[in-house]
UniProtKB/Swiss-Prot annotation:
GO terms, molecular function: DNA binding
Biological process, per Gene Ontology: cell division; regulation of sporulation
UniProt entry tagged with the keyword Cell cycle: yes
UniProt-recorded name of the protein: Probable cell division protein WhiA
The keyword Cell division is annotated on this UniProt entry: yes
Similarity annotation: Belongs to the WhiA family.
C-alpha cells in the first residue's frame, strides 16, 4: 500500500465528536470528490460521490447518517479488465434532502427559482481552528495525495475550481505554511514541496503516524547524506595526501639523482631520507621520527622547501 493510501486510511479513521467539525469535513469531502447532478428539472439535485478508498466511503456514510439522518447506499464498481481498485459510488438524491445538505455545507445557496453555487472554502463553517483542521482533513481525503518520502517530498490537493484552489491555498497558509497553485490538465493543484511543511500539514490534519513515518525517513536520509558527505570529504583529503606524498618522493628522488641529498641542508636532508624510507607515513608520523620531534606544520614546511629546490633544479635555476 502506498504512503498516500496509508495516510488516507489513518485520516479516515479520525472521527470528530463535534458537529461543527463533522460538517466542515463533510463540506470538503463533497467539494473534492462529489459532483452535482440535475434531475427532473432545475429544482432537483443529486449529490454523487466516488472514492477508491473503502475507509473514506465508510466515513462518508457515517457523516451523512450522523449529521442528517440519511442512510446512503454504497455501490461498488470494478472494471476487471483494468485490474484497478474498487470504486465506491454513493448518491444522495433530492428526496433524501440533497438540496438541504448542500445549503448546510455552504456549497449551495437557494434563490427563489434558481441555485447559486459557491466555489470557495465555506469560511462561515470554519470559525474555529478545529473546524479548519477538519476541512483540510476532508479536502485531503477527497482530493489529496502525498508522495512516498523515500523518493520525494510532495503533497497536493487537486480541485476543478480555480476559486476553490485559491481559498484552499489561503486556508493552508493561514497555518504559517507556503502552499502554491499550479494548473494541470484543466485542474488546479495546491501543493507543498518542503519536507518540514508537509510534516506540519500532516500534524494539522492529525495524521500523526504518517508524520512519524515521514520524519523517520527524513532523519535516515539526512544521516545517509551526512555520511556520504563525510566519506567524500575524507576520500578527497586522502587523495590529496597521497598525491602530495607521491610528489614529495618524486622530488626527493630527483634531487638525489642530480645533485645528491648531500646538497640539502641537514634539517631538509633528514626529513628527505625519512620520507624515502617511510613512503606511507603521515606528516605527523614523519615528525615523530625526527630528533627532536616536530609537528605536522614543521614537516610540511620542510617538504615544501624540498619541492622548491627540486623545481629550481628542473628549471635550471640551480646548477648541478
Amino acid at each position: 500500500m502506498s504512503f498516500s493510501a496509508v495516510t488516507k486510511g489513518e485520516l479516515a479513521r479520525i472521527y470528530s465528536k463535534d458537529r461543527c467539525c463533522q460538517l466542515a469535513e463533510l463540506a470538503a469531502l463533497i467539494r473534492m470528490c462529489g459532483t452535482l447532478q440535475l434531475v427532473g428539472g432545475a429544482q432537483k439535485l443529486n449529490i454523487k460521490l466516488t472514492t477508491e478508498n473503502p475507509a473514506i466511503a465508510r466515513k462518508l456514510f457515517k457523516l451523512f447518517k450522523d449529521l442528517f439522518g440519511v442512510h446512503i447506499e454504497v455501490m461498488i464498481r470494478r472494471n476487471p479488465r483494468l485490474r484497478k481498485n474498487n470504486h465506491y459510488l454513493m448518491v444522495v438524491t433530492h428526496g433524501m434532502g440533497s438540496t438541504d445538505i448542500l445549503e448546510k455545507v455552504k456549497i449551495l445557496k437557494k434563490e427563489a427559482n434558481s441555485f447559486d453555487i459557491s466555489y470557495g472554502v465555506p469560511l462561515m463553517l470554519l470559525q474555529n481552528r478545529c473546524c479548519r483542521r477538519a476541512y483540510l482533513r476532508g479536502a485531503f481525503l477527497g482530493g489529496g495525495s502525498v508522495s512516498d518520502p523515500e523518493k520525494t517530498y510532495h503533497l497536493e490537493f487537486v480541485t476543478h475550481s480555480h476559486e476553490h484552489s485559491e481559498s484552499l491555498r489561503d486556508l493552508i497558509n493561514d497555518f504559517q505554511l507556503t502552499s502554491k497553485i499550479v494548473e494541470r490538465k484543466g485542474s488546479y493543484v495546491v501543493y507543498l514541496k518542503e519536507g518540514d511543511q508537509i510534516v506540519d500539514l500532516l500534524n494539522i490534519m492529525e495524521a500523526h503516524s504518517a508524520l512519524l513515518e515521514l520524519e523517520n525517513v527524513r532523519i535516515y536520509k539526512q544521516m545517509r547524506n551526512d555520511v556520504n558527505r563525510i566519506v567524500n570529504c575524507e576520500t578527497a583529503n586522502l587523495s590529496k595526501t597521497v598525491d602530495a606524498a607521491i610528489r614529495q618522493i618524486e622530488n626527493i628522488e630527483y634531487i638525489k639523482n642530480t645533485v645528491g641529498l648531500g646538497y640539502l641542508p641537514e634539517n631538509l636532508r633528514e626529513i628527505a631520507e625519512i620520507r624515502l624510507e617511510y613512503e606511507d607515513a603521515t606528516l605527523k608520523e614523519l615528525g615523530e621520527m625526527l630528533s627532536p620531534a616536530i609537528g605536522k606544520s614543521g614537516v610540511n614546511h620542510r617538504l615544501r622547501k624540498i619541492d622548491e629546490i627540486a623545481t629550481k633544479l628542473q628549471e635550471g635555476k640551480i646548477k648541478n
